[in-house]
Amino acid sequence: MFAEFGVLNFWTYVVGAFFIVLVPGPNTLFVLKTGIGHGVKKGYLAATGVFIGDAVLMFLAWAGVAALIQTTPVLFNIVRYLGALYLLWLGGKMLWSVIMRKNSAHAGGAEPSSTILKRSLVLSLTNPKAILFYVSFFVQFIDVSATNTGTSFLILATTLELISFMYMSFLIFSGAFVTRYLKTKKKLAKLGNGLIGLLFVGFAARLASLH
């Protein structure tokens, strides 16, 4: 399928992309958190930021920016540390709200839509490993002798975004379901927010330690 467009082993790619999307990360965690704290509509808003960020990174990978980042350690480190600091800030903010007894699932209901979109977009764009991953993963399924590899890249990118959309939808509706349960379980809600905050801090440490 899509072999005429320079795509190799498409269904193998789909299976690989599916399992890659399932790997927990700051983006999926933020979408789940938003779904729990703000409902379906804002959950999809957070997911939109992730989709836009991933689309930008995939385009940059195709345009050759990945090679520039890979061969320029200073540029790689700048993006890496900015991403780590941002994750640390998000995690610290959540932990502080738990300490101050502010349940984000209730008190955070008035958070502006623009803030949610910006946060999810920044989370996607400040991960230098993502753009390098797109190149290393996509190249395995592109026929380099094809007339237009841009079309091949577009097919693979669109497929990945569709798989991501389905998984994000599952997270968002799961989050909305959890919200209804947590309305009567305030201590459990605080514990959940604290754990998510700690996970963000952990993601920050992992990103900062990447080489």
From Swiss-Prot:
Catalytic activity: L-leucine(in) + H(+)(out) = L-leucine(out) + H(+)(in)
Subcellular location: Cell inner membrane
Keyword check for Transmembrane: yes
Domain of life: Bacteria
GO biological process: L-leucine transport
GO MF annotation terms: antiporter activity; L-leucine transmembrane transporter activity
Annotated membrane topology: Multi-pass membrane protein
Main location: membrane
UniProt key word Repressor: no
Entry GO terms, CC: plasma membrane
Keywords: Amino-acid transport, Antiport, Cell inner membrane, Cell membrane, Membrane, Transmembrane, Transmembrane helix, Transport
Transmembrane segments: 5-25, 49-69, 72-92, 122-142, 153-173, 191-211
Biological function: Exporter of leucine.
PANTHER family: ARGININE EXPORTER PROTEIN ARGO (PTHR30086), LEUCINE EFFLUX PROTEIN (PTHR30086:SF15)
Protein family: Belongs to the Rht family.
Name of the protein described by the UniProt record: Leucine efflux protein
Natural source organism: Enterobacter sp. (strain 638)
Gene designation: leuE
